[in-house]
Every structure is written in C-alpha cells, then in structure tokens.
C-alpha cells in the first residue's frame, strides 16, 4: 500500500503525461496548447516574426495567426495539429486552494511542469498593450521562463487557465477558463478581431474625487470623477460633463478604473451602455452609444 504522498505524486505524474501531447512550444520563447483540430491557443505577446509551433514529437510547423487580442494577451493560431489531441476544457470554476499543474514547452524545448495551488481569483494586471486585464487566476506552480501561453490544468487534466505572465510576488497569472474565455477563443479562431469601446473621458482617482467633492461642500460618494471630456466623443454626445461622478455601468457599481473597464467591455457587443452619474447631488441616468475603434480587446475610458 503506497503512502499518501506517493499516491499524490503518481496522480500528478499521470495528469502531466496525459496532457503533455497537447502542450506546444510557440516561437523562440513561448508555449501554447492545442484546443481543437488545427487550433492552438497562446499569448498575444508570443507573436514575434515567423511563428514556429513545436509539438511533443519534435515536429515543427509554421503557425498562422487566426485572431489576436493584444490588450487581452490572447491569440489563436491556425496550424497543422495532426497527432496532437485537443486538451479538454474544465466545465466548472476552480476554487481558492485547489491543486493545479502548470505545463509548458518553452520555445519548443522539453516539457516543463510545476504543481501548485490556486492562490488568488479575480486578479487584475496590465496587458502587453498597457490596458487592464481583469479576472485573472493566480497560482503558485513554479514555471520556467517561456511558460506563457501554456496551460494550467486541474487534478483531472482539464484546462482551467492559460498562463500569461509572472506576477511581481513570484506567482503566475493565468487567463481563467470560463464562458467568456471560450467565447473569445471561438471568435479569434474564426478570425474575428475583438473591438474596444471608448467612453472618451479622463478620470480622477477615487481618493481625489472624494477630496474634491468634500472641498466644494458635496457629500462624499464612491465613484470615478470625470475631469475632462473628449470633444464629440461618446461621453460628450451622451451629455456627460466635467465634474460628473460615474457611479455605475450597466447597473453595477464602479469605484475603480478596472470595474469601469469591465462594465464597458461587457457593453461592447451591444454598442451602448447605461451609466449613472452624480452631478452635484443629483443622480442622472445616461445612455451612451459607443463609437467602435480599431481592433483591441479591452475597454478604455
């Protein structure tokens, strides 16, 4: 009869061996994962020059970008995946403390694996395009350089996240699997580039907003203070003014730029969003119609 540690070790090794054929190297210093016939998911920041995709058996094929979301750091490659099975997606959400395994094949080298725990959920970070990406999964699985784009799997070997980069605290951040990621991957696989919506305002930090309202004798209120409005932009056309305090988007309270970005991103497909602003002491409901800008992936203010 084996020890609990021995049984855990064997189980982890079995999961790694089962997922290994789906893990690929991308370019000179990245990784990816096969998610369908002819499709590989990786990070957008791995797309440099000609994209060589290296498989478990050593075969190298040239990948073509089906779709890329620079702001969201996600890309789908079209490549011959013959002989490499697609990794199954998890159908549930991971929990804090759950055991996960990070896998990679940095730059087409040997398979690398690390076992760790989910250490954080809903983490925000700056994407390669400089915009905020929200909702990341943080885990403690130790990974080598070049692991970005590789999969994070659960104890059943199912995909629960796509590694994107190391956090400043030594942990790794991953884009979590869920309905939103699946929809984004499907769209990118079809060659549909995401588009970002622009509100067209400059915002003061929440602390500044509270101090300014207090200074002019207005009651303190959580929200984002508009200190400049772009002429003829969506906010200007909707009637938002300098000094307005944005307190909700789509019925959800906003107290940070990240929450505003999330709300605007959710409204992107519809092309409009309902905002509530406080002007002085009055609450105003304002409907904003967005102008669509160049392909991107996250909302901007």
Regions found by a protein language model. Name each.
Residues 1-16, 102, 155, 159-221, ...:
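C-terminal cap/linker of serine protease catalytic domains
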Residues 20-22, 75, 79-88, 112-184, ...:
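Active-site region of chymotrypsin-like
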Residues 39-41, 160, 235-258:
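Conserved PDZ fold ligand-binding element
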Residues 27-29, 144-148, 223, 232-233, ...:
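Short, small/polar residue-rich loop motifs at catalytic or cofactor-binding pockets
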Residues 146-152, 207-217, 230-248:
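PDZ/PDZ-like domain micro-motif
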Residues 2-4, 20-23, 28-112, 137, ...:
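Conserved active-site neighborhood of the chymotrypsin/trypsin-like protease fold
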Residues 37, 68-72, 119-127, 206-208:
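Short, conserved beta-turn/loop elements at beta-strand boundaries and strand-helix junctions
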């Amino acid at each position: 009869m084996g020890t609990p540690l021995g049984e855990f070790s064997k189980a982890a090794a079995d999961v790694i061996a089962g997922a290994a054929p789906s893990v690929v190297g991308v370019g000179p210093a990245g990784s990816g994962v096969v998610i369908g016939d002819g499709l590989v998911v990786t990070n957008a920041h791995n797309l440099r020059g000609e994209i060589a995709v290296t498989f478990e058996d050593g075969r190298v094929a040239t990948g073509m970008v089906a779709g890329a979301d620079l702001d969201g750091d996600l890309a789908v490659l079209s490549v011959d995946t013959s002989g490499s099975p697609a990794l199954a997606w998890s159908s549930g959400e991971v929990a804090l403390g759950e055991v996960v395994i990070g896998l990679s094949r940095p730059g087409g080298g040997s398979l690398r694996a690390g076992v760790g725990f989910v250490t954080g959920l809903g983490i925000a970070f700056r994407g390669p395009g400089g915009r905020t990406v929200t909702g990341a999964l943080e885990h403690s699985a130790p990974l080598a350089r070049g692991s970005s784009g590789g999969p994070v799997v659960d104890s059943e070997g199912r995909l629960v996240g796509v590694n994107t980069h190391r956090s400043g605290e030594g942990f790794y951040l991953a884009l979590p699997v869920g309905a939103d990621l699946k929809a984004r991957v499907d769209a990118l696989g079809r060659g549909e580039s995401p588009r970002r919506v622009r509100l067209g305002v400059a915002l003061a930090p929440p602390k500044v907003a509270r101090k300014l309202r207090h200074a002019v004798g207005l009651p303190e209120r959580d929200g984002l203070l508009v200190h400049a409005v772009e002429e003829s932009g969506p906010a200007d056309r909707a009637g938002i003014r300098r000094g307005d305090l944005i307190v909700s988007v789509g019925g959800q309270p906003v107290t940070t730029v990240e929450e505003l970005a999330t709300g605007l991103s959710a409204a992107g497909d519809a092309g409009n969003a309902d905002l509530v602003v406080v002007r002085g002491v009055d609450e105003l409901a304002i409907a904003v119609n967005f102008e669509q800008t160049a392909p991107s992936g996250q909302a901007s203010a």
